[in-house]
Amino acid sequence: MAMKIPKSGYNRFMKEGAQHFKGTDEAVQRNIEACTELASQIRSAYGPNGMNKMVINHIEKLFVTNDAATILKELEIQHPAAKIIIMATEMQEKQIGDNTNTVVILAAALLEHASNLINMGMTPQEVAAGYEQAAEKALEILPSLVVKEASDMKNIEEVRQYLRSAITSKQYDNEDVIADLVAKACVTTCPANSYNFNVDNIRICKIIGSGVHTSKVMNGMVFKRGAEGEIRSAQDARIAVYTCPFDLTQTETKGTVLIENADELVNFSKGEESEVEEQVKAIADNGVKVVVAAGKFGDLYLHFLNKYKIMAVRLTSKFDLRRLCRTVGAQPQARICAPAVNLLGHCDSVSVTEIGDENVVVFDKNSETGKVATIIIRGSSQSRIDDVERAVDDAVNTYKALTKDGKLLAGAGAVEIELAKEIESYGAKAPGLEQYAIKKFAHALETLPKAIAENAGMPTTETLTKLYAEHVNGKKNAGIDVWKREVMDAVAHNIFDLYAGKRLAIKLATDAAATILKVDQIIMAKQATGGPKPRGPKQQDEDDDGMA
């Protein structure tokens, strides 16, 4: 009988196929390599001149974008250390909606500099402690770098300036058009207390054709579908909304009817017709000009709706119905009836129009303020429209963040250089080995303006030297002008960064880097194979019909 030799180390009590990495070289340096490799893919997408990435996900959907959050989400990265950075970017996206690329680049730069310090003999714990100390100091300095505070969130001109930077990094050359659209939409739907602004009140309707410059914003809602009946428009309309199909209900059991003569046959359907007409007439008598239903419209009901000049619109999504009720101020009805006047909604204009080759129903409130605004995005291709949508989404989230905290910092890399300068001098005075890590934190902050300059085709070392020279002379707002390829005053050019966004990005990037540095072992169990087939998703509503 063959002798069985026991395995050594972790393999003794782990399943066959499990992997185990231990120590600085195997675990820490491997993790750092993975994170820096991830950041090198994303770095070229940073800033106004950032390059686009073409990503094809697992269901073969094509994405052409420079939005870091979208790229990382669709890549489905498996490396556990890289996943920690991705989780940090997801948190940034969820809370602020912008600066996701900043988190990845800064975290990877911190890890890259940490690798050099570890090779020089410092322990990962000492490096992590130094980074945390430097981040604490950076967050202490940051409030003193605030250059402006957004106070009037209902002034379109001011709001447009605040949103331009968030859009420029995604849609270079279209920032003025998109900033104008988003500013109008946000100001239109902003409640009396701007703190209660809801991003869900800004809807997006994407229609292929023409160009981005023909995009427009309107106070109301747009649905990518036509009207059900013959009536195509209604002015100053009362609107009745139903959550049920606008049709005759069928009984579950089948009945048999004995008809003995022609009169009985005629009278059999006459009662049904008169009942339907009574219902539609009662609705018309209440002044209703538009009926919106969640299900299909029956032929008999459509006939009488046309007869009484009532427009019929079908919406298949319950979410669309809810938003429409909020827009027009209607109370949805669970069954077909003539609702009381106070339960009806009102809209200045409801019409079916053609945008490009698409029929759309437009609920237009011709007023300065409203509950819901829709941005109609035009573009030459689906991927182009999707990318503009992401820029709009970032801008709306920026507006939301400004309503919570209106502080603004100088953009174009100005705040990073000023922080790096301050932390460098702080590190020189710090005792102990942490001072090396604090200085490296300052160097890591330089990576962000360096990436802006690099992507704009500018000489990075020369640009950073000029920036430092300006900041040493007391010009705290000196940033990179990617248009003229020189150093300029970011505030004078209305280039701002969100204080809340930058603060959270520094915190998340430092936490992610410190977490990865404190890992000295990676233990990976063998992946499970086989097993029962997972259940498919439950039946849900249809998609939002082109609405985002």
Curated annotation (Swiss-Prot):
Entry protein name: T-complex protein 1 subunit theta
Keyword Protein biosynthesis in annotation: no
Superkingdom per UniProt: Eukaryota
UniProt organism field: Caenorhabditis briggsae
UniProt entry keywords in alphabetical sequence: ATP-binding, Chaperone, Cytoplasm, Nucleotide-binding
Any one Gene Ontology BP term: protein folding
UniProt keyword annotation of Cytoplasm present: yes
Function: Molecular chaperone; assists the folding of proteins upon ATP hydrolysis. Known to play a role, in vitro, in the folding of actin and tubulin. Required for correct subcellular localization of pgl-1.
Region span, Disordered: 528-548
Chief place of localization: cytoplasm
Locations listed in the record: Cytoplasm
UniProt similarity note: Belongs to the TCP-1 chaperonin family.
InterPro entries: Chap_CCT_theta, Chaperone_TCP-1, Chaperonin_TCP-1_CS, Cpn60/GroEL/TCP-1, GroEL-like_apical_dom_sf, GROEL-like_equatorial_sf, TCP-1-like_intermed_sf
